[in-house]
From Swiss-Prot:
InterPro entries per the UniProt record, alphabetical: DEAD/DEAH_box_helicase_dom, DEAD_box_RNA_helicase, Helicase_ATP-bd, Helicase_C-like, P-loop_NTPase, RNA-helicase_DEAD-box_CS, RNA_helicase_DEAD_Q_motif
Organism field: Sclerotinia sclerotiorum (strain ATCC 18683 / 1980 / Ss-1) (White mold)
Protein name: ATP-dependent RNA helicase drs1
Biased composition (Acidic residues): 18-32, 156-179, 193-214, 227-243
EC number of this enzyme: 3.6.4.13
Amino acid sequence: MAPKRNRDDDFVLTLSDNEGEDLTNVIEEELPLDPSSNKKRKRNDDIASTKKSKKSKKKSEDEDVEEEEIWGIKDADDGAMDSDFEFALEADGKGGADLEEFEGWGFDGAKKGLNGGDKKAVDIDEIIARRREKKKATGKKGEAEDEVIAEKEDVVASDEEQDAPEEMDFEDEDDEFMAEDGFGMGAGSAEESGAEEDSEASDNEGAEDDDSDNDSVASPAPHPDDAASEASDDDEDIDEDPEEAAKREAFFAPEEKPVKGAKPELNSTFQSMSLSRPILRGLATVGFTQPTPIQSKTIPVALLGKDVVGGAVTGSGKTAAFIVPVLERLLYRPKKVPTSRVAILMPTRELAIQCHAVATKLASHTDIKFCLAVGGLSLKVQEAELRLRPDVIIATPGRFIDHMRNSPSFTVDTLEILVLDEADRMLEAGFADELNEILTTIPKSRQTMLFSATMSSSVDNLIRVGLNRPVRLLVDSQKSTAGTLTQEFIRLRPGREGKRMGYLLYLCANVYTDRVIVFFRQKKEAHRARIIFGLSGLKATELHGSMSQEQRIKSVEAFRDGKASFLLATDLASRGLDIKGVDTVINYEAPQSHDIYLHRVGRTARAGRSGRACTIAAEPDRKVVKAAVKASRTQGAKVVSRVIEASEADSWSEKVDEMADEIEEILKEEKEDKILAQAEMEVRKGQNFMDHEAEIKGRPKRTWFESEKEKLAAKKLGMEELNGVVGGKKKGKLSNKDKKKLDDKGERLEGRVWKKGRQERDGKGVLAKEKGKKKVKGGKPAGLGKKKAMKPMRTGGAKRR
């Protein structure tokens, strides 16, 4: 017969801290055991009791030992405390977490998207090492031949010594020192000693001048054009265009005026901004303890969903200023259906990869997904990620449009936030067409945020972006540098522009020897400098647009990890790139504009650290140097002038000239290696086409919104923005002033040319004498007569006698 069920059996009992013993007693009372198994149960209970007694003795001994130790030191996590709870560690009394120093941003997010394959890039270091090995091999052969010749000479000399008499033995001391009255000895000794004294004195004076120049504030040399340009600049500052000011007032949202008697809101900490705990944990992970001025101003406004136009100096934390509010808003998104809601556009691939690394670190304690869509990485990998509808897409404009037109799983109808980093560059001619294509496709009702260190104040450019009464947040004065930056200028006198590479090599070999970025205007100059640095024994790597994405990532990582001391780059690396520990920036020549100069020198002196920027400037760079010095003086930044001895620069220039043939041979060998690699790639491409012909032909053709001609025109405009008009000014009718300049230039190149004087114009002088010499005895001029000269010459007949 089944046991009788209790009425309370249907209830599910809960456990509490004080009900453990009572509940076990109740269960034992309500569930009686079968009487047939009582004997067996008793035996088992006896055995268990003996085991329990032994265990209890051991436990009592262990408890006695544990009482002597610190309580809880060896306990595992029992889940009693919330895992998200954090203790606020005090660091120097400021409330910041005392964390380990953050190591910097990596390129791990981009590596998974690199195109796989066995494509091997041409390595300059390998070519230089190969040539050195060949030289060593040939040198060893030459040394062996010299040793054989020397041995033969020694044998002949020993035979002669044996035949010579003993009186002919010479002392070594007489061989080392010649007599004072010998040939050439003592001649001009006074002059030489005087010259040595003068040189020593001049060296001491030069050293004093260098010390004084390094510590003195540079004053630009007076120039006839400076006065007029300064006057025009002052007029522009004073007479602001009232129409532009009215446009600006109507376009931007009015500034919030503080209420009288109310305390101003100070967002001195991230906790005071009411950010979520996962975001605060992400900020602590990367070592952000206190918000920068641009962050404390931008984050509260961006959290309200308003459009923002932000500007601050380089290295002030603008990336985190727009990523933190984006992540905070995404924490409260609907999560049932995955949707792409944010697009962040960058002008360069490296900047987008870095922004992806920053966003991933800050969102490491959330479930927000990111996708990196930049050129040079695998399209298939990016399409697979976009198919999962990531929350944030970080991209360059070209690849974003490519996916927008050719990836069927990617839609932009759900975008709610658009961010343009380095917005002034994005609004320039090179990116204008691509940006217009994106803005006309994405939804109009969105939040738009623009950030840059040199933010444009032109309302016409900002209207194109579709901003809706944006809030203007400019922390620092426009076109200013970091306060911890020291700017140096090296002036090249007229006629010494060709020695520029000598000055650069002297700086890199003797003054700035590690953690240096050198900027060039053109890719070919950066590549040639890379070869010269390799031949000079300086560890360098290059970064420019002619390199593949894999090469570019490897170059930046080699410089970041300390494998290379110098990064030779074009303006590709001038914007946004944050590499930890960059001490110095050198401008091989001044850039096209002051804005580009600010971005270049902003690669150092970031986040409160000190740094130096050195510019090698010639006469054509006067305009940019003058603007930089004027802005720095207005700001109160330190500007110094560095003087390098001409002899030092000349010696390095001579070394470069000696390398000219070897540089050309290396370039030729590199070109041959590239042609071979290209041929191998074409062979593999043809083989793949033969193996997968049906699949390749079945793929839909990729489309673009511009023709090839329009793409080339846009590319040309972008180059002109960076380097100016390549072909010079457009040809037109020359003024008399320009003609005079050209004539003077031609005379300087040709040397002094004889001109007519007053006597020659009056028919006298040298010309009259020359005319008299040309006449013959009969008074007729020499040469053919008039009628004879008019006759045509025979072509086929017999010769006249």
